[in-house]
Amino acid sequence: MRFLFLITPLFFSHITLAATGCIPEMNGTWSLNSYKSLDPTNLAYEVLVFSNTGEEQRYLMEFENKPNERRSLEWSVPCDGKDHPSPDFPWSTAPNATVAITRLGDKSEFVVQKENGRLTTTYTRVLADNDQTMISVGRDADNKVIWVRIFDKDK
């Protein structure tokens, strides 16, 4: 029995665990490149400003859904894969909306939004081009792609 206890860690030592925490390379200002994006809502303007810590994603979002209707919101949530109360998103008015962020790898994360415990939206964010491009692919509750947004990192 003692032999099995000693050898088991060696046997499974090759297994790699998924990255945890938030992605520090996301920190900075990201501007929507509407020419490269596929967005049926025709979002003309969106800027994300990330200031992540090791365990918490923090960002300021400025956006314009309609001409002359620019808005912003600021929020933070742990990157632990658990549901947390969601900020007052303009597109979500449910009092018990939640958001969960799970890091998938060194340069990617998965975000889940729910209202009343039911899935509403998911999106995957991936850093590319030497961390100078962020790709966001959004899906609805039926897993249908609803946007592909490309953001360029401001220098």
Go through the PLM ranges and name each one.
Residues 6-8:
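Sec-dependent N-terminal signal peptides
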Residues 13-15:
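N-terminal signal peptide c-region/cleavage motif recognized by signal peptidases
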Residues 19-155:
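Hydrophobic small-molecule pocket/channel-lining residues, especially in calycin-type beta-barrels
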